[in-house]
Amino acid sequence: MTYYDFRNGLQRINSILYQEMDEEESRRIPSESQMTYSNGYTTWVSSIFVDIRNSTKLFANEDREMVTRVIRSFVSEVIEVLQSDDFDEIGIRGDCVYGIYSTPKIKDVIEVFNKATYINSLMGLLNRQYRKKNYPSLKVGIGLSVSEDFVVKVGRKGTGINDRVWIGRAVSEASNLSSYGNKSIYGPIVMSDNFHYNLIKYKDNGCKDEWFRYASINGKTVYHCNVTNSYFDDWIERNVRP
């Protein structure tokens, strides 16, 4: 039976709403041990979300073994690409895999973009393998965003149930943009205006203007592309038969 102590609940709500909060700036996303229920950190964050297109149809397929093998292989290899020394959080939300990174420098933002191009190439490898077993191919949308966000710890003190919440644009925007990738006019990779600006700010970073196409989503400027990792593509062509 559900039980909720109203009086204690009201006290907890008021303690959260009226307590003093310390806000600190940090070049890196703070560790779990640095976070409390009364502080928060402002830091530059980049986020990448990888969202499967038409996942409802896939999950409704009666061949559960096939669906399991496809999803497990997809999630496993996307996570492998997302891992790095600078990641703060890698997770799974339904049919979506995401990564959140400390990106205080432009080179860090470029590295997150590189992960997106690897994943775009990875889909070619996965789909070749799926076709060999007569499995359906996957398409994904990849959303990218960067912003100076505020990270706070939330949960219920004393229960061990807690997590960090990202207040700002990077996480929510990347999640939203991933839903547009590989749909309609959009390429697989869709990024925020600020993320794109960081990629092309310095011409010697390897990114080229002609890779990206301008678009507007709900009045906001975004850019999209279909860039892959050429080294990965070459390896696939040499080593994996179609």
Question: Where are the language model's segments positioned?
Answer:
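Catalytic strand-loop-helix junctions within cyclic-nucleotide turnover domains
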Residues: 102-108, 142-162
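Structural signal for well-ordered, non-membrane alpha-helices
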Residues: 75, 79, 120-127, 178
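Catalytic NTP-binding/metal-coordinating core of nucleotidyl cyclase/transferase enzymes
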Residues: 33-111
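Short helix/loop segment flanking the catalytic signature motif in cyclic-nucleotide metabolism enzymes
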Residues: 63, 92, 97-138, 144
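Hydrophobic alpha-helical membrane-association signature
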Residues: 70-74, 115, 119, 173
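Catalytic/regulatory signature loops of cyclic-dinucleotide turnover enzymes
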Residues: 145, 169-194
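Catalytic-core segments of nucleotide cyclases and related cyclic-nucleotide turnover enzymes
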Residues: 153-178
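Intrinsically disordered, glycine/charged-rich C-terminal tails and inter-domain linkers
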Residues: 1-31, 182-242
